[in-house]
């Protein structure tokens, strides 16, 4: 039996703090070829999740600690939905349909979510990054993160 414990979250958050990406994950599925992928993702508040979509695959997430703002976008980077997700928010989790551009914005420093999505996982095809969202290493990331933090439904982040 695989157990989800406070020490698991503590370990994930310690790894996130030490990671250049400021996040870490723990897979519950055994291998990348499993038909259902299940994982916990821990993030610090300064972690940048580049806007992306999963072609032909749905995604379900529930925030179990902290809080995130989750934004969805149209093809050109206009915000179509913005929700606060977390144990103390009005929304605990959500399911995204396939092919939906989305981004996570951590709003609490020690935040953890559980994600379930269709497998198998293929690093080449798992996610398509939004062309209007800067790559993680780009110098534009800090300004883009500020834009995400303030973006309202109907506004463009591109």
Protein language model features and the residues they cover:
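Conserved short histidine dyad/triad with adjacent acidic residue
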Residues: 40-56
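Short beta-strand His + acidic residue motifs that chelate non-heme Fe in jelly-roll/DSBH
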Residues: 51, 70-72, 94-96, 102-107, ...
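Glycine- and acidic-residue-biased ligand/ion/polar-headgroup-sensing regions
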Residues: 56-76
């Amino acid at each position: 039996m695989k157990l989800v414990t406070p020490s698991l979250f503590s370990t994930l958050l310690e790894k996130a703090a030490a990671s250049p990406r400021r996040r870490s994950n723990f897979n519950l599925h055994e291998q990348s070829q499993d038909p259902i992928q299940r994982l916990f993702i821990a993030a610090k508040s300064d972690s940048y999740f580049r806007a992306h979509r999963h072609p032909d695959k749905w995604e379900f997430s529930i925030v179990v600690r902290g809080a995130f703002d989750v934004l969805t976008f149209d093809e050109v980077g206009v915000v179509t939905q913005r929700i606060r997700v977390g144990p103390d928010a009005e929304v605990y989790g959500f399911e995204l349909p396939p092919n939906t551009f989305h981004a996570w914005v951590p709003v609490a420093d020690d935040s953890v979510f559980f994600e379930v999505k269709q497998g198998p996982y293929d690093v080449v095809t798992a996610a398509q990054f939004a062309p209007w969202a800067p790559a993680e290493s780009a110098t534009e990331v800090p300004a883009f993160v500020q834009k995400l933090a303030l973006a309202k439904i109907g506004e463009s982040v591109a």
